[in-house]
Structures are given as C-alpha cells and as structure tokens.
Amino acid sequence: MKGLVIKNTGSWYQLKTDRGELIKAKLKGNFRLKGIQSTNPISIGDYVLIEKDLYGTAFISTIEDRKNYIIRRASNLSKQSHIIATNLDQAFLIVTVNYPITTTIFIDRFLVTTEAYRIPTLLFFNKTDLYNNHDMNYADILIHLYKSIGYSCYKIAATKDEDLLFMEKLLRGKITLFYGHSGVGKSTIVNRLIPNAKQKVQSISKHHNKGMHTTTFSKMLELPSSSGYIIDTPGIKGFGIFDIEKEEISHYFPDIFRFSPYCKFYNCTHQKEPACAVREAIKNHYISKSRYISYINILEDVDMNKYREAF
C-alpha cells in the first residue's frame, strides 16, 4: 500500500493512502541503521510504502524517490539536518517588517536554500493593515529589491478577502510550503483558506515584538475541493544552512552570481581579493549591501560548520 505523509507527531506518522484513507504508521527500526544523519528521515510530503504486521499496526517500509526537498541545520551547533518538507511545487515565505520583524538575513538564508534545491519561492509581506508609513515604505524598499532579483513579491493582509482569494489562486493544484517566523500570520492565513484547519493562533509578545510558537508540528492540509495542499510549519527564529559548500554559496545569490564571472580570480570569495567585480558592483549600487551582508553571514556560518552528509 502507498501513502502520502501529511503529519508527523514524533514516533507516529499520519498518512493519506492511495485509497483515500487516513491511517497512522510507525517507521521501521532499520531506517535508523542506514547512516541517516537527519533528525527526521521521513518528512511531510514523502510518498512511502506501508506494511502491516499481524496485529494490524502499519509500518513505513520504503521512501519513494523525492522530486526535491528543503532542508536546514537542526540547531546552531548540530551536525544533523532537519528536512522541512519534500516533493514541493513552491514555497511561500511569509514576511512582516513589523509585528514581528523579519530580517533580510533570515529572508536570504531561506532563499539561498530554495535556490539550491530549485524550489520556486514567492514572498508575501503580511500584516500591511497594521503598518504605519515608515513600515510601508520599508516594505516597498524590500519588495523593489527582491523583485529586481527575480522573486515575486506581494503585499497582503490576512484580514482582507481579496488578498486571500489572490493567494488561493496561486495555490491551486500545487503542494506549497508556508514558512516564516512565529507570529507572521501563517496560521491565520491557513485558517482563512481552510476553515476546518483549526490551526492555533496566538498574538505576538508585546514586550519583545516577537511571535510565540503556535504550530507544534508541520502538517499538510488539503485545500477545499482538493485544489492543492498547504504545508504549515512551526515558526522558527533562525535558519541554519546545511549541505551547501562555501564555494557554492554565491551561486544561489542570483544578483551576486551575475557579476562573479568578471572577478579576476575564478575562486574569488568576494571578500578581500583584488579586482573583485562583486565588491565593485556593490559600490556602484548594482548589488544591495544587505544582500552582501547576508552572503558574508552565510559564508562565515558554513566555514564553521562543514557538514555535508544530510542522509
């Protein structure tokens, strides 16, 4: 029997079978013996084969080949990876410039990973109904920046019906990952798109202007009329890059990669090398300084954590 993994609550996985049934299954113990370094060898979005024992307990015996996946480091000091989701058609990064603040470093870390794994990513600047003039101007600056690089960006408010209808059109017929900090409004959007989802919603901390975790486990939710799936994920503070070599990082900054062939040295890291076309482009405002700061931030992070074997 074949199944699609739609939820993971620790040792149990909830699956939707090819017969349309919802069942719970465990992972067979021998998966732990295959040298897998990921904290979760089975992920939301995986297609798996299921076996049942004499007592009727379902076990996942095989993972089918993945079309793609998105991965992050499990924690700041970890040698392990955490697979966020697999077999995606696209990712929606939910961003807020206030209530709470999403940094450009967080945005760029996520975009580098989706570039590396060839997952089309759209940016949604949420809570625009709460923005003052300063917030709106800053959102417009970021939208101009990321649109110039090639990313689709949209200003939305989860309270507005027309914005939700627009998002719903983009979701049709696709498996979409929702990602972002706690408190940016992912669960509110999901609840409005899928009224029976009942994802928990909690206000942000007034003291720290940061979101508090409401979604505990990642979960795949079906849109009405079977028009697609959303994978809602727990909000996180940071995003650790995993499985990308130092020399590859600039490849996943399209704006930096555009100029790197013109550097004097083929292996230029765009830091202190002479005749660096990238640093010259920054001086001439062809590359945003915030993007370069993110690039250096990731470069230093990867330098300290040379862990590549994710599986």
Curated annotation (Swiss-Prot):
Keyword Metal-binding: yes
Record's keyword terms, sorted: Cytoplasm, GTP-binding, Hydrolase, Metal-binding, Nucleotide-binding, Ribosome biogenesis, RNA-binding, rRNA-binding, Zinc
Residues given in the record as GTP binding sites: N126, K127, T128, D129, G180, H181, S182, G183, V184, G185, K186, S187, T188
Binding site for Zn(2+): C263, C268, H270, C276
Classification via PROSITE patterns: ENGC_GTPASE (PS50936), G_CP (PS51721)
Pfam family, one: RsgA_GTPase
UniProt GO cellular component terms: cytoplasm
SUPFAM superfamilies, A to Z: Nucleic acid-binding proteins, P-loop containing nucleoside triphosphate hydrolases
InterPro entries: G_CP_dom (IPR030378), NA-bd_OB-fold (IPR012340), P-loop_NTPase (IPR027417), Ribosome_biogen_GTPase_RsgA (IPR004881), RsgA_GTPase_dom (IPR010914), RsgA_N (IPR031944)
Top-level taxonomic group: Bacteria
MF annotations from Gene Ontology: GTP binding; GTPase activity; metal ion binding; rRNA binding
Cofactors named for this entry: Zn(2+)
Keyword GTP-binding carried by entry: yes
Matches recorded under PANTHER family: SMALL RIBOSOMAL SUBUNIT BIOGENESIS GTPASE RSGA (PTHR32120), SMALL RIBOSOMAL SUBUNIT BIOGENESIS GTPASE RSGA 1, MITOCHONDRIAL-RELATED (PTHR32120:SF11)
Record function comment: One of several proteins that assist in the late maturation steps of the functional core of the 30S ribosomal subunit. Helps release RbfA from mature subunits. May play a role in the assembly of ribosomal proteins into the subunit. Circularly permuted GTPase that catalyzes slow GTP hydrolysis, GTPase activity is stimulated by the 30S ribosomal subunit.
NCBIfam families: ribosome small subunit-dependent GTPase A (TIGR00157)
Quaternary structure note: Monomer. Associates with 30S ribosomal subunit, binds 16S rRNA.
Protein name: Small ribosomal subunit biogenesis GTPase RsgA
